[in-house]
């Protein structure tokens, strides 16, 4: 219609994405006059696309690889987590001002709260240091976790995780953050025994995993005595 609001996904490639079908179904189910499209935008094209968002009044976008860092560099304002990580996966257009968010951590913490669990003052253990896991680490620290212990193999993510740990410490000095190799078995047992929250959560977004966990909700979550 003449008032249809436009939303989208930017990345490259995006032709395989299920996001348009999912989002447009949601618009229809909720009676929203909106349309969600996938835009194949390469990293070097992000600045021009951002200008187009203002020109065409695109209300918001999700951002996928390889554009998350470039998008963050072209925002008017970043959420605390996005600023710390230096990447965004969501852009919101409010009257021509673009706000960048990284929502993985926000969604994780919000879902815990929905299940009656808060992270403030808690000792947390996280396995993994990829993109989503990093966002979760950052959000838990920003939301008042007492300590965060990260275990990750010495893969390409490990060195990046070391740098992120130092950034979190500088931003949230009251939160104790440590990074260990997966081979540190004794430390792993010690930290798990001392942790306040044990969570088994599937944050993988692909067809195979959806067969086991179609809605990506918490599988097990409980407070330790």
Region locations from a protein language model:
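Rossmann-like adenosine-cofactor binding region
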Residues: 174-225
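Phosphate/diphosphate ligand-binding glycine-rich loop within oxidoreductases
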Residues: 2-115, 225
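Residues at the starts of beta-strands that form the adenosine-phosphate
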Residues: 6, 123, 146-147, 176
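Glycine-rich adenosine-cofactor-binding loop
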Residues: 11, 100-105, 120-145, 152-154
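Short beta-strand elements in bilobed, periplasmic/extracellular small-molecule ligand-binding domains
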Residues: 31-39, 148-149, 173, 177
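Active-site glycine-rich loop that binds ribose-phosphate moieties when present
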Residues: 107-112, 117-119, 131-138, 162, ...
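Conserved acidic residues
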Residues: 59, 146, 193-196
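NAD(P)-binding Rossmann-fold cofactor-contacting core
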Residues: 143-172
């Amino acid at each position: 219609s003449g008032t249809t609001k436009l939303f989208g996904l930017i990345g490259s490639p995006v032709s395989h994405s299920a996001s348009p079908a999912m989002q447009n179904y949601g618009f229809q189910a909720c009676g929203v006059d909106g349309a969600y499209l996938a835009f194949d935008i390469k990293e070097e094209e992000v600045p021009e696309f951002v200008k187009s968002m203002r020109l065409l009044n695109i209300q918001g976008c999700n951002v996928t690889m390889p554009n998350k860092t470039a998008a963050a560099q072209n925002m008017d304002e970043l959420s605390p987590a996005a600023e710390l990580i230096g990447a965004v996966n969501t852009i919101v257009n409010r009257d021509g001002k673009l706000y960048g968010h990284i929502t993985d951590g926000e969604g994780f913490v919000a879902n815990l709260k929905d299940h009656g669990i808060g992270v403030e003052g808690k000792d947390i253990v996280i396995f993994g240091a990829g993109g989503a896991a990093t966002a979760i680490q950052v959000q838990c620290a920003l939301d008042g976790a007492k300590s965060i212990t990260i275990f990750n193999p010495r893969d390409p993510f490990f060195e990046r995780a070391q740098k992120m740990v130092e950034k979190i410490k500088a931003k949230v000095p009251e939160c104790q953050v440590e990074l260990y190799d997966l081979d540190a078995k004794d430390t792993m047992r010690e930290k798990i025994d001392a942790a306040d929250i044990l969570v088994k959560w599937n944050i993988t977004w692909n067809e195979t995993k959806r067969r086991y966990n179609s809605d990506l909700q918490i599988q097990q979550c409980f407070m330790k005595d």
